């Protein structure tokens, strides 16, 4: 897939840019027919990214997960794992000695798209051949439908996560709840 638009933006902004080449697609779509290719792919992609981060001498990485990602992960965890869980805002990876932060956790996907449109930022489409036909897409569509049927439900789901005493999440504070009730 063509990353040229992102590369050009980074050059224009004078931001260092690295591409990590992997064989993840070959692993995921081999004859083994992985039962849960999305989960394995996510783990392998994060592993490759985190390894590059360490090679660059960094000890912290910011993932771009937004509020909708957190809600969708919670829905997936409830449906497929039977637990109330979503990834935490800050995670320390012991084996990598790397801190993962998610600074966009209070930003909705719609706000991200609005920012992208306002500033005419380039978009590189997901090259995955199953994009749009995944369990995550199912969760995204389900949350969208629930929010259409029950306006405000998505924000209430996020508030439930903030208040849910999920391992790795900070204790509930009014600051976190502000605007998400």
Specify the residue positions occupied by each region the protein language model found:
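ATP-dependent adenylation/nucleotidyltransferase module used to activate substrates
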Residues: 1-74, 80-83, 110-118
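Surface-exposed beta-strand edges and their flanking turn/coil or helix-capping segments
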Residues: 3-4, 32, 102, 114-115, ...
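Residues that form or immediately flank small-molecule/cofactor binding pockets and catalytic motifs
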Residues: 22-24, 105, 128, 162
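Short, basic, helix/turn surface patches
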Residues: 42-53, 90-96, 143, 147-162
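Basic side chains
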Residues: 43-46, 60, 102, 135-136, ...
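Catalytic subdomain that performs nucleotidyl-dependent activation
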Residues: 68-148
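The feature marks non-catalytic terminal segments
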Residues: 121-181
